[in-house]
Amino acid sequence: MKNKIIITLIVIISILGYSCGDKDEDTTVKKPIVEGFYTNLHAPEGGDFVKLKFIADISTPEALITNSENNWDIAFRGTMIIVNGGVKTGSGNEPERALISSISSYIDILNMNFNDVTISPDLVNEENWDKAGQPKIPNISGQGWFEDDGTYITPLKDKTIVLRTTDNYYVKIGMYSYYKDALPETTDDPAYYSFKYSFNPNYGISTLDD
């Protein structure tokens, strides 16, 4: 009888302990997705690449810009977008890459509307780095993020850039305009990017929608 009581108590204690463990996991507080809109990121053709670094405590979109030579996530110049992973494409005057896979960033472009991208696919693959002569995001009309009709550069519909940063955070980016102040049907001031983004400030978590 005593043995049965002891066994019963052990089972009850085990169940209670397991339940408490579950509660601890369930009460983990996750930071909310950070959504932002960057207007007029000026990255003219022939200038330096403008580098962005996504960090857990983003204050304003403008705070994304970094001057670090090799601690950056994504960079823009003209219509070209590069990632801090792989090797230089050969376009000239590119920033240094991290060169170590664990602290590199990874990038891809999905054939999906920005709002429909709720989780990033697995990006940690060398296929999602830049290569010599070939940036991961093609800088070619109709193949990357834009269409060029010879007069006007337009972001392609249903294209979303996904990024895993050098610090293992996930971001999605939706291009809105390539012209200053995002004015419709203007070509007066090109290379002024406007885009929306969603950034998950929780380390290693690839969901991109609350």
Q: Which functions belong to the PLM regions below?
A:
Residues 166-170:
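Glycine-centered tight beta-turn/hairpin loop motif at sheet-sheet or coil-to-beta transitions
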Residues 1-2:
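N-terminal secretory signal peptides that target proteins for export/translocation
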Residues 161-165:
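A short beta-strand micro-motif
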Residues 172-177:
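Short beta-strand-centered aromatic/proline hotspots
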Residues 21-159, 181-184, 197-210:
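N-terminal "domain-start" segment
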Residues 188-193:
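Short coil-to-beta strand junction motifs in C2/discoidin
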Residues 5-14:
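Sec-dependent N-terminal signal peptides
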Residues 15-19:
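C-terminal motif of bacterial Sec signal peptides marking the signal peptidase cleavage site
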